[in-house]
Structure formats: C-alpha cells, structure tokens
Swiss-Prot record:
One of its GO terms (molecular function) is protein-macromolecule adaptor activity. One of its GO terms (biological process) is protein import into peroxisome membrane. Residues 112-121 have a biased composition (Polar residues). Residues 29-431 are cytoplasmic. InterPro entries: Peroxin-3 (IPR006966). This is Peroxisomal biogenesis factor 3. One of its GO terms (cellular component) is peroxisomal membrane. It is a single-pass membrane protein.
C-alpha cells in the first residue's frame, strides 16, 4: 500500500496510457475491418454487376437467334430471285435448241435458216429478257443488303432493349436494398450488408423476386416493352427494304448485266450502296433508323395489341412511356448510328470475303485476315450475282444452337459491346 501511495500518480498514468492504447487499437481494428468489409462489398457488387451484364449479352444473343427467322423469312419472300432465274432460263431454251440444231448440221441451207428462226423472237420478247436481267440484278443485290441491314438492326435493337431492362431491374434491386436498410434501422435491426445480399443471390436472381419476397421486376411491363420488337419484325423491315432498293437503283442501274467487274470495282459499288443507305441526304450526316425500330406514337397501342398473351387493355402507361422515350433517345444518338454502321460494315466484310472466291481469291496470308485477290481479275456480273444469291441463305438462317457466320461476326463488334455497357451503366435514368 505504501508503494501504491508513493507511486499512485505513476500507476494511474500507466493505467490511463494502457487503456487509451487499447481503445485506440480497438478503434483502428474496427476501422480496418470496416474498410475491408466495404471494399469487399464493393468488389462483390462490381463482380455481380459484371456477371449480370455478361449474362444479359448472352440472353440477347439467344433472343437474336430465336427471332432471326421471323425477320428474314419475309425478306426472302419479298425478293423472288429463284423465280426470276427460272423465267430467264425458260426464255433461253428456244435459243439453246436453235444453237443445238445449228451445231448438228453441216448443210449450208439449214445453216441459213438459223438466223431466220433466231430473228423470229419478237422485239417485245427481247425487251422482256433484258428487263428480267435488270430485275434479277436489282432483286439479288437488294435482298443481300436488306438481309445484312435487317440482321444488324435486329442485333442492335435486341441488345438495346435487354440492356435497358437489365439495368432497370438492377437499379430496382438496389433501391429495394436501400429500403430494407432504412426499415432495419427504424426497427432497431441490423440490415444485411450489400455483400451479404449479393452472396444470398439477391442481385443474381433473374426470376423477378428478391430474397425477402418482394417483387423487384414487373414481368408485365417487361413483356409490354419487349412486344415492340414486333414493329421491326413486321413493319420496320419493309421501309428498310424500300430504303435499300432506292440506293440499289441509284448505284446499280447504270451497271450492265453483261458487265465484267474487278474486285476493287465491286467493292466500290458495295461501298457506295451502303453510303446511300446510311446517308441518303447528306454524306456527312447519317440518318437514324428510328422509324424502322419503333412505331410512331399513334400506332404504339396497335403494336401492344399484337401480343396475344397480354389480355389487358393496350395502354402505354407512364413507366412504359419513359422506357420507350429513352429507347428512342438512344436510337437517335450519334453513338447508335456509328454502332449500326459498324455492324453493317462487319456483315458486308463477310459478304465480300465470300464474293472474293468468285474472283479466284487465295487464302489469306498469315499476317492479313483478308483473302488475296488478283487486281487484274475480272468476273462477269451474272457470276457475281449467282454467288450473292447463295450468300442470302447464310444471312437468313438462324435458330438457337445454329451457327450463323454473319450474326457471329456482328456480335463481336467492339462498338456494340461498348454501347451496350453505356446503356447498362446509365444509372441516372429516373425509375
């Protein structure tokens, strides 16, 4: 006791220092674990966001292949290439029989009758045959361009729709999380952390309900919004084809069906056609494809009525209105025009690689992805048209699990991925 009394101040000071050190260390540890937990939650949230984004793109790819035949079948029917070819062949047969007769006889008298039989074809018949060749040229080229553009617009619009919905559902889940936190604090409960909810699958559940049983996705609204893809599949592609046909007429009508083209000449004609489709009024100002992708406002309820599973009245409510307005804003943006242009360009690149075979192209060198075409090679236009006609089948075929080289290449366009990421991460949109 005497020792304690003599050193009371020192002992108290030592105890105070020890207690302060303990409290300080405990505070530092708590702060450390708090920061560590926050970083872990943020990392988990980013990983879940990335997973949801990637899953969204895979869902879009599947949807594209599921819808492809619904879009390309009427396009193929609009352009009866095989029917025109059959009519041309039927007009060749009499001439072929005359030529066969000419080659099988040595009589000069018989030989003199051949021009008489040949000239028996009326001027009207010759004009009809010429017109058929013009029709075959326009129809074959218009079909190829319409299919490439239809594929590109289907990819663009499906990605846009599903990323808008995916982002909206993600933001709704975050709002629901914040609400859970506020309710937990008000009742004196400890609200689950962001990381806990992520681990529980709160942000990974795409079925439409949270782990707390609250609906965070409105399936009826989603279905109404997705119904607007009907417009491209049934109406939009028609105006798209008309836009393509006008460009094809302006570029290709001066080209004779009997012309011989080099690969560079063909590439230049293809490029001019794309330019007129994308920029029909001003080369420096591309037109958007809003009228091909979304209906005018006065026809929106008509589009909603096309959904047989929706028994409710076809009314565009406030939330759906905001979704459609945002979709239109994205379509009219300069970034969207660039993405669609790049999608079409990538599809036409595959198309040109296939046509290069007609020019006797050799396989690409190891340092170049493109086939090697002799600059002096010339090919008659009918041979080029025949190859174009074969490519249409590859552009049009598609269903989940079936490969389509054109769709695969377009889906890999970097500008499309970047645009999808911008859409998915635009969290400032009002819910």
């Amino acid at each position: 006791m005497d020792f304690f009394r003599r050193h009371q101040k020192k002992v108290l000071a030592l105890v105070g220092v020890a207690l302060s050190s303990y409290l300080f260390i405990d505070y530092v540890k708590k702060k450390f674990f708090e920061i560590q937990g926050r970083l872990s939650s943020e990392r988990t949230a980013k990983q879940n966001l990335r997973r949801r984004f990637e899953q969204n793109q895979q869902d879009a790819d599947f949807t594209i292949m599921a819808l492809l035949s619904s879009l390309t079948t009427p396009v193929m029917e609009r352009y009866p290439v095989d029917q025109i070819k059959a009519e041309l062949q039927s007009k060749r047969r009499p001439t072929d029989r005359v030529l066969a007769l000419e080659s099988s006889t040595s009589s000069s008298a018989t030989a003199q009758t051949v021009p008489t039989m040949t000239s028996g074809a009326t001027e009207e018949g010759e004009k009809s045959k010429t017109q058929l060749w013009q029709d075959l040229k326009r129809t074959t080229i218009s079909r190829a361009f319409s299919l490439v553009y239809a594929d590109a617009l289907l990819i663009f619009f499906t990605r846009l729709q599903l990323n808008i919905l995916g982002r909206r559902n993600y933001v709704n889940s975050v709002v629901a999380l914040a609400q859970q936190g506020r309710e937990g604090n008000a009742e004196g409960r400890v609200a689950p952390s962001f990381g806990d909810l992520a681990d529980m699958g709160y942000f990974g559940d795409l079925s439409g309900s949270s782990s707390f049983g609250e609906t965070i996705v409105d399936p009826d609204l989603d279905e109404q919004y997705l119904t607007f893809s009907w417009w491209l599949l049934n109406e939009g592609w028609v105006s798209l084809s008309e836009r393509v046909e006008e460009a094809v007429r302006r570029v290709w009508d001066p080209v004779s069906p009997k012309a011989e083209l080099g690969f560079d000449e063909l590439s230049e004609l293809i490029g001019r056609t794309q330019m007129l489709i994308d920029r029909p009024l001003n080369p420096s100002s591309p037109l958007n494809f809003l009228s091909q992708l979304l209906p005018p406002r006065e026809q929106e309820e008509y589009v909603l009525a096309q959904n047989p599973s929706d028994t409710a009245a076809p009314i565009v409510g406030p939330t759906l209105r905001r979704l459609l307005d945002e979709t239109a804003d994205f379509i009219e943006s300069p970034n969207a025009a660039e993405v669609i242009e790049r999608l079409v360009h990538s599809g036409l690149s595959v198309f040109m690689d296939k046509l290069a075979v007609t020019f006797g192209a050799t396989p690409a060198d190891s340092g170049s992805p493109y086939p090697v075409v002799l600059p002096t090679a010339k090919v008659k236009l009918p041979s080029i048209l025949a190859n174009m006609a074969r490519q249409a089948g590859g552009m049009a075929q598609g269903s989940p699990g079936v490969e389509n080289e054109y769709i695969d290449v377009m889906n890999q366009v970097q500008e499309l991925t970047s645009f999808s990421a911008v859409v998915y991460s635009s969290f400032d949109w009002a819910l």
